[in-house]
Amino acid sequence: MILDRLNFIENKYDELSVKISDPSIMANQKEWRKLCKEHADLEVIVNKYKEYKEATEELEANKEMLSEESDQEMREMINSEIKDLTERKKELEDEIQILLLPKDPNDDKNVFVEIRGGAGGDEAALFAANLFRMYTKYAEKNRWKVELMSANETDIGGFKEVVFMIKGAGAYSKLKYESGAHRVQRVPDTESSGRIHTSTATVAVLPEVDDVEIEINDKDIKIDVFRASGNGGQCVNTTDSAVRITHLPSGLVVSCQDEKSQLKNKEKAMKVLRARLFEQAEAERLAGIAEDRKSQVGTGDRSERIRTYNYPQGRVTDHRINMTLYKLDSFLEGDIDEILNALITEDQAQKMKAMGNTEF
């Protein structure tokens, strides 16, 4: 029963309230901060549970009043109050169920986004640039900071590959649903016959990983330095500031040339490498989970075709939830929350289903 779990959480919260006020625990700052975070996480659930108990008590009190009331006008007023309280109680039950869902420990983290032009040549590279702009605009709307890590540009303004970081609270919780294959259908500027072409770009969204989460031994990496290049491969730097890091055990390769400093490029490349190794470890972990326990909303497979952008129809369709919006222009300007929120809702519904007994 959910009520048993809520009572346990409430007792745990009360215990933590005492602990974080204990001077002996406060002396150990690391332990104290850990307990404070746990206390803050539980506080949201406890406060919602208090609201639920108050609504339940009010509802029962009104039902008792109704059974004793004979005046018709008063009965109508009480019935109206009962109706409102019943609806409020149901809303609180739904909110509590969502709060009790297992938390993704990466949700509050910054993210690395990798976009690669897939099938379609120059047109795919141009679409990759469109996606880069879309995510940049979305980050701006959320007041998140965008930091370019590396880019392999084409002569006509597209990207064979672009890797960038988005820093901001909750960035991963929203953008993790963007991992997968994105398909575009449109008439290229170079197409004289007006024929619609289909191209793809793949997106990978990786949470930023702390040094302590993924440890990389120096003996496991090979570092090469080279001169940074710009559009078409021309040299834009006279020093060997660009860095390529190869992780020997996994074969993963990361390059960074955005900074003028070799040291900064190395730091950035190591961050991306850590994120990729973490993603690899997570994929292996999830592969060991029974299929029926996995969320039905894709949040990680780069090969999964997740969305189609149809320019002639002004349409964007997310295939995971069969949702279509006829607002492609605004979507590409970063107005992507309508689909992201729908994906989050579907993900929550699947997780609640996996939880089994959700009776109060």
UniProtKB/Swiss-Prot annotation:
Classification via Gene3D superfamilies: 3.30.160.20, 3.30.70.1660, 6.10.140.1950
Post-translational modification: Methylated by PrmC. Methylation increases the termination efficiency of RF1.
A Pfam family the protein falls into: PCRF
Record SMART domains: PCRF
Gene Ontology CC terms, in alphabetical order: cytoplasm
Alphabetized UniProt keyword annotations: Cytoplasm, Methylation, Protein biosynthesis
InterPro entries associated with the record: PCRF (IPR005139), Pep_chain_release_fac_I (IPR000352), Pep_chain_release_fac_I_sf (IPR045853), Prokaryotic/Mito_RF (IPR050057), RF-1 (IPR004373)
Keyword Protein biosynthesis set for record: yes
PANTHER family found in the cross-reference section: LD18447P
NCBIfam families per record: prfA, PRK00591.1
Family membership noted in the UniProt record: Belongs to the prokaryotic/mitochondrial release factor family.
Name of the protein described by the UniProt record: Peptide chain release factor 1
GN (gene name): prfA
